[in-house]
């Protein structure tokens, strides 16, 4: 299109033809016409921006070729256009041929090979530094762990394995940093975006502080931490005690992500899907597929929807069922996730139904409050929302109230007049700055006049002295 001289966006208009020809076979073309056309238009605009920027640089290269009486554009420059500015090599070639020039394709391929080698090298270094074989993979499946912490925070389990300094050991003692694997545990292992539990493993002789919990080889659950007291041996019985406050904080944020997901779909459209998440006791981070920034008005609507459902006190139910039954119930599945024949379905009244293996509350009212802190882009077509719930919202609102109180005190005004007072000070400062500028200009003129008055003529030459 560019080579034919078409400057305006046109590709998205062809959608009408596609819909007319294929709409019956693909009904979603009709159902989501507005959304599809908007996405095509946005992508076309982005591509045109890339083409415009690359064309400007390529024109500069062409002028250099003319000035140097050369006929071939170096492969390094062709690769730079491609790698840095996303300018396709075949388009570069077509434009060059239009004006009687050629490109060094062999040089371009050489640069491409170098780039691939750099990527392989970087990946190899990363794997060498951060990837290590899990020592638990050397054991058999008998070390597997059973998670029984959805409804209980405490149980007793037997030590199936201990890892210290990346080696399987039989015992650990006070001060040792280690990994303990139990046959049964109430500790949730990091997964589905939710961080692992923390807490205590103990018996009458020993205490092990669990800092975090992760999944390990052979379906194990790894309690990662340090021995605070006594010694622990394989086959010892240990009571698992999950930190209730931290588990509840994580559950509040996890349940809130489900409410947020539904509210986003209701407000922005059914095209919105989860693209990633992070659930910690302190806050939640939720990535979605969406093609443009979410406006303040939309964020306000989304936030209100979530808080409205919280206030409705909907029961949260978790059931294990067949994947087909879950789909029939309308459960949302995450794109790209692999599910077995049986799945865990988390329902929040009739409002939200999702497949999820994380820990949740019993009722939406336990979320307390929900507050969006920020929204922004993290990749093309992906937006990120960060939010807080429960006590974190209380602390956030308190800190804002204290900030307003301090501002009122500093500006010597009341809260309901704070904005007007701040605006008045800004205008006053602008006026004073203008007056100061005028005074300085006037003083400069006066100084110049005074300097001219002090000139002395010496043999016909005017001499100024300061």
Description of each model-found segment:
Residues 1-466:
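A glycine- and charged-residue-rich anion-binding loop/surface
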């Amino acid at each position: 299109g560019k080579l034919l001289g078409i400057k305006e966006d046109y590709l998205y208009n062809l959608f009408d033809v596609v819909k007319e020809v294929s709409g019956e076979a693909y009904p979603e073309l009709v159902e989501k016409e507005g959304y599809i056309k908007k996405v095509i238009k946005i992508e076309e605009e982005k591509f045109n921006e890339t083409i415009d920027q690359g064309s400007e640089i390529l024109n500069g290269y062409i002028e250099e070729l003319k000035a140097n009486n050369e006929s071939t554009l170096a492969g390094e420059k062709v690769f730079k256009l491609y790698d840095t500015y996303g300018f396709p090599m075949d388009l570069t070639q077509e434009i060059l041929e239009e004006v009687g020039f050629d490109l060094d394709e062999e040089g371009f391929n050489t640069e491409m090979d170098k780039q691939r080698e750099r990527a392989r090298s970087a990946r190899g270094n990363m794997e060498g530094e951060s990837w290590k074989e899990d020592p638990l993979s050397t054991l058999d499946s008998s070390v597997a762990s059973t998670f029984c912490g959805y409804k209980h925070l405490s149980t007793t389990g037997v030590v199936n394995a201990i890892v210290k300094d990346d080696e399987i050991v039989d015992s650990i003692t006070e001060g040792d940093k280690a990994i303990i694997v139990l046959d049964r545990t109430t500790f949730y292992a990091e997964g589905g975006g939710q961080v692992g539990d923390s807490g205590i493993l103990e018996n009458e002789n020993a205490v092990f502080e669990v800092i975090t919990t992760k999944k390990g080889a052979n379906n194990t659950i790894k309690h990662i931490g340090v021995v605070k007291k006594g010694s622990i041996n394989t086959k010892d019985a240990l009571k698992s005690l999950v930190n209730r406050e931290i588990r509840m904080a994580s559950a509040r944020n996890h349940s809130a992500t489900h409410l947020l997901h539904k509210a986003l779909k209701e407000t922005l459209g059914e095209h919105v899907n989860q693209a990633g998440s992070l659930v910690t006791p302190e806050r939640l981070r939720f990535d979605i597929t969406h093609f443009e920034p979410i406006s303040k008005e939309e964020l306000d609507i989304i936030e209100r929807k979530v808080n409205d459902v919280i206030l409705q006190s909907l029961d949260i139910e978790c059931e294990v069922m067949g994947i087909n039954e879950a789909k029939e119930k309308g459960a949302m599945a995450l794109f790209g996730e692999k599910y077995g024949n049986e799945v865990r379905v988390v329902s929040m009244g009739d409002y939200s139904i999702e497949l999820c293996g994380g820990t949740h509350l019993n009722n939406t009212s336990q979320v307390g409050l929900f507050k969006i802190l920020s929204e922004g882009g993290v990749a093309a077509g992906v937006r990120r929302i960060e939010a807080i719930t429960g006590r974190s919202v209380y602390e956030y609102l308190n800190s804002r109230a204290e900030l307003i109180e301090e501002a009122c005190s500093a500006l010597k005004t009341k809260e309901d007049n704070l904005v007007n007072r701040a605006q008045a000070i800004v205008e006053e400062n602008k006026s004073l700055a203008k007056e100061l500028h005028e005074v300085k200009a006037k003083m400069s003129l006066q100084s110049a006049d005074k300097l001219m008055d002090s000139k002395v003529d010496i043999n016909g030459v005017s001499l100024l002295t300061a």
